[in-house]
């Protein structure tokens, strides 16, 4: 079952990658064809040629980003995730410092529940997941972001909510797919990998990710991560 799931994930990743490469490749082909046709006939000025080259350069940069992202995604499946000891309070300090740095134009609050117990986690992995959730929330929040961190049954549970427009039903189903972008993000530069990476890393750390909407409106993404010693 595990091998079948990994194979299915690999096929989805390859399909998403191929789909996202198609647009910049099509644009490159179109601009190259135009230049090859018009330059010999003297139908374009030097400035128009430079403008076309500039557009082509931007699409080459997009291709490079996708290739690098794809390489990093493949590596996530194989990286070792050793656990270290860290106190709950120390982790919250890390979370608070990160939120203060990232939420410079948004208001955030962090609520916690749990004694200052010792957690057994990979801090780099947990911080990457947290930063992805927070960055995603910042992108859509109108003004407020609510962060909840609790310990439940040997799991570290991190929830990040915002007061934005929330997820559409189809987005709830597809938000963790690689390179997925909502209709609001089509024209943006981000690759649509944050929640997918968070899903992979949380599963590698013995947990999972849940995508939902708050009853009062806005999105809520929750990650559970195993934090016991075994």
Residue ranges and their predicted role:
Residues 162:
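Acidic ATP/Mg2+-coordinating residue in the GHKL
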Residues 77-82, 114, 118-121:
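Conserved micro-motifs of the catalytic ATP-binding
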Residues 201-202:
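Detector for a conserved hydrophobic position within an alpha-helical segment of the HATPase_c
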Residues 143, 206-207:
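Conserved glycine-rich
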Residues 55-63:
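Short alpha-helical segment of the dimerization/phosphotransfer core of two-component systems
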Residues 144-154:
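Short beta-strand/loop element within the Bergerat-fold HATPase_c
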Residues 137-138:
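Short helix-loop "hinge" at the ATP-lid/N-box region of the Bergerat-fold HATPase_c
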Residues 167-180:
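Short conserved segment of the HATPase_c
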């Amino acid at each position: 079952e595990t091998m079948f799931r990994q194979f299915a994930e690999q096929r989805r990743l390859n399909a998403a990658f191929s789909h996202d490469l198609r647009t910049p490749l099509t644009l490159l082909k179109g601009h190259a064809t135009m230049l090859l046709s018009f330059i010999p006939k003297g139908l374009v000025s030097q400035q128009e040629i430079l403008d076309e080259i500039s557009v082509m350069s931007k699409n080459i940069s997009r291709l490079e980003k996708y290739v690098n992202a794809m390489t990093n995604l493949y590596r996530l499946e194989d990286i070792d995730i050793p656990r270290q000891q860290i106190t709950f309070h120390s982790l919250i300090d890390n979370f608070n410092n990160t939120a203060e740095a990232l939420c410079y134009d948004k208001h955030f609050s962090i609520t916690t529940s749990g004694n200052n117990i010792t957690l057994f986690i990979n801090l780099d992995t947990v911080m990457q997941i947290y930063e992805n959730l927070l960055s995603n929330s910042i992108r859509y929040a109108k003004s407020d972001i609510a962060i909840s961190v609790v310990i439940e049954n040997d799991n570290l549970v991190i929830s990040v909510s915002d007061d934005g427009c929330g997820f559409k039903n189809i987005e709830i189903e597809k938000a963790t797919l690689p390179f997925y972008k909502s209709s609001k993000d089509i024209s943006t530069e981000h690759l649509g990998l944050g929640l997918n990476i968070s899903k992979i890393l949380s599963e590698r750390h013995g947990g999972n990710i849940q995508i939902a909407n708050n009853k009062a409106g806005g999105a809520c993404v929750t990650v559970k991560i195993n934090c016991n010693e075994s």
